Design a protein with these regions (language model features):
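Active-site-adjacent beta->alpha loops and helix N-cap segments on the catalytic face
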Residues: 2-5, 46-61, 76-80, 102-112
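Conserved phosphate-coordination/catalytic loops
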Residues: 17-21, 51, 74
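Conserved anion-binding
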Residues: 1-40, 44-45
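Catalytic cores of alpha/beta
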Residues: 55-92
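Structural preference for beta-strand elements that scaffold enzyme active sites
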Residues: 9, 37-39, 67-69, 91-94
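C-terminal helical cap(s) of enzyme catalytic domains, especially alpha/beta-barrels
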Residues: 81-122
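Short phosphate-binding/catalytic loops that engage adenosine nucleotides
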Residues: 35-36, 65, 118
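Short secondary-structure boundary segments
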Residues: 1, 42-43, 72-73, 96-98
Length: 122
């Protein structure tokens, strides 16, 4: 999902093709048709490491009643703390490069989340 003129659009073909579909409505319809969870990747924030797209995540959490997993944008531990504090309806945060390149240790992330009162398995 990516922002286009102030709204969220569904993109296809690796983010190269705008389908013209409203992203929030499309996700709601997917859940209405049986999707059991949503892994929401923001094309705008993916790989940038400036934090998750909190506005998009909140918009999705407001319209679905299944687990929502945030993807795209994590650049450090502080982004996860911000995510879980700002969007209580989000169930998980996903990241890759910060772990692959050794920028963040999973244990350190879990301990910081725990210190901030965020439920995490240690």
């Amino acid at each position: 999902v990516k922002r286009v003129d102030g709204s969220f659009h569904v993109f296809a073909k690796g983010g190269r093709e705008d389908t013209g579909m409203d992203g929030i409505e499309w996700i709601r319809r997917c859940v209405d048709n049986g999707a059991g969870e949503v892994v929401l990747n923001s094309i705008d924030t993916d790989g940038v490491k400036n934090g998750f797209d909190l506005e998009m995540l909140q918009a999705v959490c407001d319209v679905v009643n299944v687990p929502v997993i945030a993807s795209g944008g994590a650049g450090g531990i502080d982004h996860f703390v911000e995510l879980f504090r700002a969007i209580p309806g989000v169930d998980a945060g996903l990241a890759a490069s910060i772990f692959h390149f050794g920028e963040v240790e999973i244990r350190d992330l879990k301990e910081e989340l725990h210190r901030n009162g965020i439920n995490v398995r240690l």
